[in-house]
Amino acid sequence: MCGRVRLSSDYSEIKIKLKFDLDAPAPNFEADWNKPPTAPMLVAIRSVDGKRTPKMMRWGLLPHWAKDEKIAYSTFNARAEEFTTKPAFRDAWKRGQRCLVVTDGFYEWKKLDPKGKEKQPYAIAMADDGQMVMAGLWAKWKDPKSGDEIQSCTILTTSPNEVMAELHDRMPVILDKADWPKWLGEESAPDEELLAMLRPSPDRVLKVWPVDKKVGNVRNRGAELALPI
């Protein structure tokens, strides 16, 4: 599971690292150290002209058939082992609506007792302090009442590596840089190869540290949330 992420990096640096289309309008986002589901997320998609394009999308995928937005609270993650057949995600997969979800890292809560009543939050980041780029899917949804179109996304999850297994039984799929072009469809790849990318990250690429429990409150969004305790 991945239910909180952070992104505070400067966009001018992100667009170079991610090789975004430099002519694309800069997305409007603010630094946020505690993004919950339904928050706007910075993603990259392959546009109709083949360019790597930045977008802001709501976190929590809204399939085209959804009656309302409530489903987003259960679709912010998609399990790599089953998303291709799940009604909420399979259309996005079949249509090739894959994306890169750009973050600086995420948080996870470790149970301190068997019943999970007491938990300690941890921050997870790349060991080299680089961007953490997660595998995602995206979709368009039209609000039946207002007629507004909403673009939304989900983060794919997989089994944990040894580092993450100490905290949780799932982790987000963090894509290798070499896999970005194929995941976005900039380079062709069979489904089998794409699905093989959805694996746990090597332990060495991540670092983990405990943080203040204030991160549990989504009203708290500042930089102090990611500081080690």
Please state what every model-predicted region is.
Residues 1-229:
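Short linear sequence motif anchored by a di-proline
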